[in-house]
A protein has these predicted regions:
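Boundary/entry segment of secreted carbohydrate-active catalytic domains
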Residues: 1-16
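Hydrophobic faces of well-ordered beta-strands that scaffold small-molecule active sites
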Residues: 3-7, 33-35, 66-72, 107-109
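Short, contiguous strand/loop micro-motifs
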Residues: 7-9, 40-42, 75, 79-83, ...
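Residue-level marker of alpha-helix boundaries and capping positions
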Residues: 11-13, 45, 86
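Active-site acidic/histidine proton-transfer and metal-coordination neighborhood
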Residues: 16-23, 78-122
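Acidic (Asp/Glu)-rich catalytic clusters
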Residues: 20-29, 46-69, 90-103
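N-terminal substrate-binding region of glycoside hydrolase catalytic domains
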Residues: 24, 28-46, 71-76
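Glycine-rich, proline-tolerant flexible connector loops at the mouths of alpha/beta enzymes
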Residues: 34-60, 111-119
Length: 122
C-alpha cells in the first residue's frame, strides 16, 4: 500500500510551508504528495524557492517522496471570450511545463463554479 498526502488538508494553517510539508512527508514515510497550486504559487511569488529548486528536491535520490499531482487548474471551463480561453490555455501550458520539471504526470482540474450564464443551452 502507498500513502499520499493531500496538501489541501493544511493549506490554510498559519505559517504553512510546502517545503515543510515535503520534509514531514519524508519523515513520516509518505510516498506521494498532492501539491496545492495556491500554496506553490504563493511561496514562489514570495521568493522562497523556484520551480527548479523544487525539481532538484524531487530529483535528489536521497528523497523517496514523489509528486502525485498538481492541484489544480481551477475554473477552466465555460469561458465566454477568446481572451478568457487564451488565459486558461496559457496557465495550462505553464502548469505542464512545471509538471515536467517536477516529474509529475497528473493535473487536477476544477470546473467553474462562478457562472453568470446557464451552463446548458435550451
Amino acid at each position: 500500500m502507498k500513502i499520499g498526502f493531500n496538501e489541501g488538508c493544511n493549506r490554510f494553517c498559519e505559517n504553512h510551508s510546502v517545503l515543510e510539508d515535503l520534509d514531514l512527508c519524508e519523515k513520516y514515510g509518505v510516498d506521494y504528495i498532492d501539491i496545492q497550486s495556491e500554496c506553490l504559487d504563493r511561496e514562489i511569488a514570495a521568493g522562497k524557492y523556484t520551480i527548479d529548486d523544487l525539481a532538484a528536491w524531487f530529483a535528489d535520490p536521497k528523497h523517496h517522496l514523489k509528486m502525485l499531482s498538481y492541484n489544480a487548474l481551477i475554473f477552466f471551463n465555460m469561458k465566454q471570450t477568446q481572451e478568457e480561453k487564451d488565459a486558461v490555455m496559457a496557465k495550462l501550458d505553464q502548469i505542464i511545463e512545471d509538471c515536467n520539471k517536477l516529474q509529475c504526470k497528473m493535473i487536477v482540474v476544477v470546473p467553474s463554479m462562478d457562472l453568470t450564464v446557464p451552463a446548458t443551452l435550451d
